[in-house]
Amino acid sequence: MEGGFFTADVLSVQRLRAGARDELLKWSKGTVYPASGTSAKSEVASLAIEEARKKIESLLPGGNIWFTSGPDEAANWAIKGISAAQRRKGSKIIAAPDSHLSILNAVRSIQGEEGVIASTASAINIETGVLLDIQRWEQNISENHPHARRIIDARGAIGRIDLAPLTRSSDVIILDSETCGGPVGVGALWVRKGVRIEPLIHGSGQENGRRSGTVPISLVCAFAAACIEAELKRTTNTKLWNKNHSQLEDAIRSIHGIIHGETEARAPGITCASIPGYFAEIRIQHLEERGIIVSPASGCSSTAGKPSHVLTSMGVDTDTAMRSLRFSLPEDTTSKDLKRLIEALQN
């Protein structure tokens, strides 16, 4: 709890882990030298960035990490970079209807009709927590589009699920920082070794010519620290999330709420629910007046006033979707915090 407020949806905020905060402060003091410079100070920065890269690559073996300004850029790079690299083989990319809008809009911007060159899927549906059936997805691609590249959006996956199946089943993985306790403004693209992908941003050739633009040392070092800490705490946090979210969902059912995706395998620590009564925007305001911060199902203000495209793609009617909220409880949620949230929802 901060300043009397309890944030019940950490996926929608920047909540820095201790290690990430330390790295952010460490590399924000005094004069910061660009890693691409030629001075000894720049060499220190370059080594720090490479160390951050290696830390994240240690969690995702078999590929290389290239830093971006965030997951939306990484998604656009994955879609457009693969499309450019595969243009002689076709122009069509398959995206699940419940994909993040950055995926859907990137696909729409370049979509062709000839030859499937890639298929995308989300490791975790970031709104409902529903997990991708990787084996089924992989089998479908192998049977119908055996030469298509496989792109997995792994937003929210670090520190919540085992990453090994993702690296075994994908050519490209989209990663974000803030959902694992790192800073906003940084993300990454994991590219399997040997997979060709064209640059999205052209310029001075940073990131070994793959992504131009000065690499923000403080952000990437904080991102890497958050990844390592989140993974180290994954087993412990999973137990806490399962316990707390089970109590929360029981309470929501007691007031005739609907838990979306409850019959499917879900990632720990994510609950999407539609609660009878007020539309989500009104309920969010009422909860904030009681010192509790939650988000609409999409977790994004840019879609406020609209039903979640994820929920409608699941067959949820517009009225129910407009009453949906997302909860992703902090790992340090206390019994007092949980009781306060449940009482606010029930009353």
Predicted regions located by residue number:
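Pyridoxal 5′-phosphate
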Residues: 1-347
